[in-house]
Each structure stands twice: as structure tokens, then as C-alpha cells.
């Protein structure tokens, strides 16, 4: 899944979160103006390769018809565990309207995040039941929070959204691997799409018994069309409409960082279909290979070399592409459900198939 950039500008080299949180003026208008100047989350080095992130949320001043918030949940990709029965929450700073949460991560961290402020009736309260029933109840509760999610208005980069439409902000630390391709998007620019090279088709699958949109895009190059690499993007509706990737691909190709290629973006239809088709569904991959790809090749030829074929996905999409490759892999590693997420913000890879 892509993340967005963040730069923090300060009058000192780094903001001092402990001093800021202890400031008697914390929560005042002048205090928030200073936070807005710095940008959030606040970033403080704590060792050669670790930093402390301080996330801040400003609670609106409640009027007679406005809710009083009991919790502000935070979801930071790769740091917090949204499967937990004790999800991470911000703390209120005394009697102020300041809520904060801190985490230590590696200095090359990059990830998206959102806040979910809730009133008492939306706080997690799991019913009695089997472990499986409680896990499902927790998942249903978490999904119900997506409509309450907010991006961070004090983050200096342009907000974006998840494939579900959830508002997101992002952290891009100084040592993170550069993602120059997305810098114009992070700055709020709109990259144009060459509609002459974009085709939208409807894939009617006999094997799956359904129909969906598929976007086909090709980038410029001098290579023989029949030798062009193929890239398949799952959750294609996200990359085609919500976070259009076509201008980014053109820029990277023109800069020589990507070869001229054919890109196939596959719609999920809806969430129920996504949940069935992407994880561990051999019929989906069989239909893709025997039904969809021949249609694509007739419109935009591409290589049949596996070494020049890429499948990209996230979440269920990642599981799907893993299943696509698992029978050919000598070893396959994943993070067990029960393993903790370390404070450094990286999942422990502890299991092997």
C-alpha cells in the first residue's frame, strides 16, 4: 500500500514534546499556532536510528449540540495493531482540548495514519463468546469506526484516502527510502492523465460469474510492444479513481526509472467480492490468467516472461498475490496473528511455510 511525505520545519533543530506538553499555555491559540508552524507529528531523534513521534489532535470546543469525546483512537500503519482488543488511544492533556499519543519508530519509517474520535457508545465493548466470535466482533467494531476517521489538519502534506475512502495523513521520515515519484502528489499537485493511452473495459468472467471494470494503461517507450513488462494492480479502482497513478507512472517512465510497460488495474466490484476473491481464491487467479489477460493482450501486447511480470496489492491484495506465488516459492514468511508489533514500528516475521 503507498504513503505520503512529511517535512517538519522548526525554529529550533527539533521540537521538544515534553516541554510543549508541560507548557502552562498548552491548548491555547498561540500554542496551537506553534504546532501548526512545526507540523505534526512532532519528530524528535532519540538515538542514531530511532525517533519519537508525537501525534496531536485538537478537540473541537463542544457546544450544546456537539458530542463529548471519550476516546480518540489512532491507527498508524505498521505501528499500531488494529486487531487488538486494547487498541491505541490518545491521552487527553489535563483539562485541555489537547489529545496526544507518542511512539518510537525507526528513523526510516514511512506510514499513513488517521484519528478516530468517538463518544462513549462507540468505545470497544466486546461481548462474551468464543475467541473467534470475539475476533469477529472486534473486526466489525473496527470497521464501524472508518466513517469516523479523520486526517491530521496539522500535517504539512496533502491528505489522501485509503481504498475504503478513509481519510489519511502520513509520516515520511528523513531516512526513509526516497519516493520522488509521489512528491508532486504530496505537495497537492494533480498530475495529468493521457486519456489517449487509457482504456476502460468490462471484464465479464464466466468462471467467476460476475463483471467488473478493468483499466488498461501503457506508458511511452521504444521497446517492442510484445516485449513490454506487465504490471497488475489489485484494488485497481483505488489507483484509477481515488489516487490516480497514471501521471506518476508517466513521470517515472520519462525519467528512465521505469520501463515502458502495460498496467492492468482490476476493480474489486465491492467489499464482499474483495473478501472472497483476493485471499486464497484459485478461481480468481485462474480467471485472470485464462479470461482477462488474453483480452488485455489483444488490446495492448505484453511479454509472457514471468520475470517481467509484477502483481501488486495490499492487505487482502497482498494475500492474493502471495497465494499467486506461494506454490513456486522455496520459502514463504509471514507474521503470525499472535505476534506483537514492536515499538520500532516493524512487524516481526516469525513464521515459515
UniProtKB/Swiss-Prot annotation:
Highest taxon in the source lineage: Bacteria
Presence of the UniProt keyword Cytoplasm in the record: yes
Main localization of the protein described in the UniProt heading: cytoplasm
InterPro entries: AB_hydrolase_fold, Enterochelin_esterase_N, Ig-like_fold, Ig_E-set, Mycobacterial_A85_antigen
Catalytic activity: Fe(III)-enterobactin + 3 H2O + H(+) = Fe(III)-[N-(2,3-dihydroxybenzoyl)-L-serine] + 2 N-(2,3-dihydroxybenzoyl)-L-serine; Fe(III)-enterobactin + H2O = Fe(III)-[N-(2,3-dihydroxybenzoyl)-L-serine]3 + H(+); Fe(III)-[N-(2,3-dihydroxybenzoyl)-L-serine]3 + H2O + H(+) = Fe(III)-[N-(2,3-dihydroxybenzoyl)-L-serine]2 + N-(2,3-dihydroxybenzoyl)-L-serine; Fe(III)-[N-(2,3-dihydroxybenzoyl)-L-serine]2 + H2O + H(+) = Fe(III)-[N-(2,3-dihydroxybenzoyl)-L-serine] + N-(2,3-dihydroxybenzoyl)-L-serine
UniProt xrefs under Gene3D superfamilies: alpha/beta hydrolase, Immunoglobulins
Entry's Gene Ontology molecular function annotations: enterochelin esterase activity; iron ion binding
Pfam families cross-referenced by the UniProt entry: Enterochelin_N
Keywords tagged on the record: Cytoplasm, Hydrolase
Signal sequence extent: none
One cellular component (GO) term of this entry: cytoplasm
Location of this chain's protein in the cell: Cytoplasm
Entry similarity comment: Belongs to the Fes family.
Name assigned to this protein: Iron(III) enterobactin esterase
Organism: Yersinia enterocolitica
Higher taxonomy: Bacteria, Pseudomonadati, Pseudomonadota, Gammaproteobacteria, Enterobacterales
Gene it is expressed from: fes
